[in-house]
């Protein structure tokens, strides 16, 4: 896994974060490159959901607003909405997940990415949580 990784434990759950990503209160991560954000769910989220058995992907070309539910991940435990961390247009989806949803469990920050957004306002990225802020967000919810 590229990028610096930190391991954290909150309420008995050990999970990894990457220092080069930004995060949301609803457990998504985003990586911004050349105006396009790659989005997935955090290691913490996949551990909470347990075995992921299905994914509903957004349509390419769909315009989305920050905070809008755009995808769904189904696990043996629950179904979770995945929210757009930034406003823009869906330009790519990870179709591998349709046959291999477990990639989200196996590699949430790599092969398990869910969709990509061409971002309307790259400045919006700075409003997302740093790894440290995300850990605090998880602590507030879990402890």
From Swiss-Prot:
GO biological process, one term: glycine decarboxylation via glycine cleavage system
Cofactor: (R)-lipoate
Coiled-coil stretches: none
A GO CC annotation given for this chain: cytoplasm
Pfam families, per the entry: GCV_H (PF01597)
Subunit: The glycine cleavage system is composed of four proteins: P, T, L and H.
The family this protein is said to belong to: Belongs to the GcvH family.
Name this protein carries in UniProt: Probable glycine cleavage system H protein
Source organism of the structure: Aeropyrum pernix (strain ATCC 700893 / DSM 11879 / JCM 9820 / NBRC 100138 / K1)
Lineage: Archaea, Thermoproteota, Thermoprotei, Desulfurococcales, Desulfurococcaceae
């Amino acid at each position: 896994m590229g990028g610096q990784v930190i391991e954290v434990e909150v309420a008995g759950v050990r999970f990894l974060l990457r220092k080069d990503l930004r995060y949301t209160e609803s457990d998504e991560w985003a990586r911004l490159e050349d105006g396009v954000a790659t989005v997935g769910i955090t290691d913490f989220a996949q551990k909470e959901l347990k075995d992921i058995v299905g994914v509903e992907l957004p349509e390419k070309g769909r315009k989305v607003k920050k905070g809008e539910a755009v995808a769904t991940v189904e696990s043996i435990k629950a179904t979770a909405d995945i929210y757009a961390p930034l406003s823009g247009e869906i330009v790519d989806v990870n179709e591998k997940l349709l046959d291999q949803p477990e990639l989200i469990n196996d590699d949430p920050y790599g092969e398990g990415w869910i969709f990509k957004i061409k971002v309307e306002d790259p400045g919006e990225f700075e409003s997302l949580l740093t790894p440290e802020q995300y850990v605090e967000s998880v602590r507030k919810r879990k402890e």
